[in-house]
């Protein structure tokens, strides 16, 4: 029986009977995979702690006829402190959902995995504004799944630009003043510059960025459009994020 080992984060889980459940793990080596954890629902199961949502650990699997089964696991960080604050829980659930909707099963993406785990640790240690961190992660997600935004050049005529008043969902970037605007939305120069800056900034340095609410709201709307357009599903957590932003 061949065993597969990888670090990973539990994205979500689903009960399949009174004892067993399926967990979806974003792994470093194999991308997102679904895994049967037999007996994980039992109170004394060795799998119980390692199969909770958000848990980051070392996992060992074996391949069955149709899917992986969990053989063993060791917790690196449970991230269960996320559960104690509603806003933090909602944002972290949203990040997990982004990974789930953007990644096909078995599609490795080590760069995105690194950004994902780093973002979790930054949130855990309260390093920076969680909303700005989420926008930065969305930009990394778009880049590492093939939808990188072109913000240094006009997306139509390819002329170099310092800023733009319009972002096109069709052309994945800014539109200069000489080109026709289509398939996107207007943006203020401040929000455009902030998007461009965040897109290039390492995730661990995002704490240095201080954005006002208007800019954060603009960025939220712009990136929500790209995410809704390019992935198979719209994250359900977006509804909760909207509630948080309205409070």
Curated annotation (Swiss-Prot):
Any single biological process term in GO: DNA recombination
GO cellular component: bacterial nucleoid
SUPFAM superfamilies: ArfGap/RecO-like zinc finger, Nucleic acid-binding proteins
Keywords, comma-separated and alphabetical: DNA damage, DNA recombination, DNA repair
The keyword Signal belongs to this UniProt entry's keyword annotation: no
Gene3D superfamilies on file: Nucleic acid-binding proteins, Recombination protein O, C-terminal domain
Classification via InterPro entries: ARFGAP/RecO (IPR037278), DNA_rep/recomb_RecO_N (IPR022572), NA-bd_OB-fold (IPR012340), RecO (IPR003717), RecO_C (IPR042242)
Tagged with keyword DNA repair: yes
HAMAP family: RecO
Similarity remark: Belongs to the RecO family.
Protein's name according to its UniProt entry: DNA repair protein RecO
UniProt organism field: Clostridium acetobutylicum (strain ATCC 824 / DSM 792 / JCM 1419 / IAM 19013 / LMG 5710 / NBRC 13948 / NRRL B-527 / VKM B-1787 / 2291 / W)
The encoding gene: recO
């Amino acid at each position: 029986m061949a065993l597969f080992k990888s670090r990973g984060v539990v994205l979500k889980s689903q009960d399949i009977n009174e004892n067993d459940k399926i967990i979806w793990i974003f792994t470093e080596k194999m991308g997102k995979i679904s895994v049967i954890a037999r007996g994980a629902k039992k109170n004394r199961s060795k799998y119980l702690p390692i199969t909770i949502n958000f848990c980051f650990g070392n996992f060992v699997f074996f391949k069955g006829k149709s899917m992986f089964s969990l053989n063993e696991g060791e917790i690196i960080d449970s991230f269960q402190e996320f559960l104690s604050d509603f806003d933090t829980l909602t944002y972290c659930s949203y990040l997990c959902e982004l990974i789930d909707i953007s990644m096909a099963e078995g599609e490795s993406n080590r760069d995105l995995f690194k950004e994902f785990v780093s973002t979790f640790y930054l949130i855990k240690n309260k390093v920076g504004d969680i909303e700005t961190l989420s926008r930065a992660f969305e930009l990394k997600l778009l880049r590492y799944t093939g939808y990188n935004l072109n913000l240094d050049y006009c997306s139509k005529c390819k002329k170099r630009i310092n800023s733009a008043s319009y972002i096109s969902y069709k052309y994945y970037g800014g539109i200069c003043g000489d080109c026709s605007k289509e398939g996107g939305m207007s943006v203020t120069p401040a929000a455009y510059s902030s998007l461009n800056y965040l897109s290039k900034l390492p995730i661990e340095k995002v704490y240095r960025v201080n954005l006002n609410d208007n800019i954060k709201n603009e960025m939220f709307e712009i990136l929500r459009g790209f995410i809704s357009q390019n992935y198979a599903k719209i994250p359900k957590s977006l509804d909760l994020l909207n509630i948080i932003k309205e409070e």
